[in-house]
Every structure is written in C-alpha cells, then in structure tokens.
Amino acid sequence: ANTRSRLRMLTLYYYATINDSIVVGTGNKVEDFGIGFYTKYGDGGVDISPIADLMKSEVFKLSAELGINKEILNAKPTDGLWDDDRSDEDQIGANYDDIEKVMKKIEKGENPDDFDNELKKVFDIYTRHHNANKHKMVEIPICYIPNNLKL
C-alpha cells in the first residue's frame, strides 16, 4: 500500500509540474497529527496542507457549509490503496469520531484513567498509532556538522 501511495504522489507531482501548480494535501488533524495515518513521502508528500489544523468533524462542517456533494460527505473513509473494500477505520481499529473525542480530551488535559471503557480502548489504539507514527509528524532531523570538521 505504501508503494501505491508513493506512486500516486509521483503522479500528482508530475501533473502539478506540467501545469505549473502545487500538490494540496487532504490530511486533517486527526489523521496527520493524531494517529499519523498517511504514508511518509506518499500522500503525506504535499506542498500545502490547508486542513491539517482542523479536526475531522470541523472538515465535515466546513464541507457542508461549502455545499460539498452529500455523496462525498457520506462516503466511507478509505485511502483507496487496497483491492478490497476495507475502510480507514477497519485499518485503524477505531472510528474517527471516537479518536477525535480522545484527542480533544487529551488536549484538555483529562486523565485517560477517567475515560469510560470504550474510550480507554480507543485511547490505547490512538496511543499505539501515535507513538508508532510519531516519526512522520516531526521535521526531518538535521545533522549539524561543526565548522571545524567542514572542508
């Protein structure tokens, strides 16, 4: 699936280049900075991420306000990288609404020990994905060479 995502990115950049354009990201705060549900140098390889600071629910509200087609708004979330009908939520193990609830509680400083049993399960899923994908959410580390070692 990562290879498909990276080939998709290459295709998007090809068309952006020949059309003197940019590649616009579709990742939201839950996907990009919550659980890191994207492919590094694949669908995460974009020039601008206009909705990356919006929770998924906020993206839906904005989309409805803009009059986006209901068929699109109600579509099952999928990355389209598999040859079956698995959804994002099937792959993640939790639904986006619950992941967003967990993220909001964490942002408010609430203690996960106080979450109900279902949200505790989602918190565990969120934490597992967040920790495993944290490398995607930080800038590429730079190795600074001391001046006395430079040629």
Where does each model-flagged region fall?
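ATP/NTP-dependent adenylation/nucleotidyl-transfer catalytic domains that generate, transfer
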Residues: 1-6, 10-22, 26-151
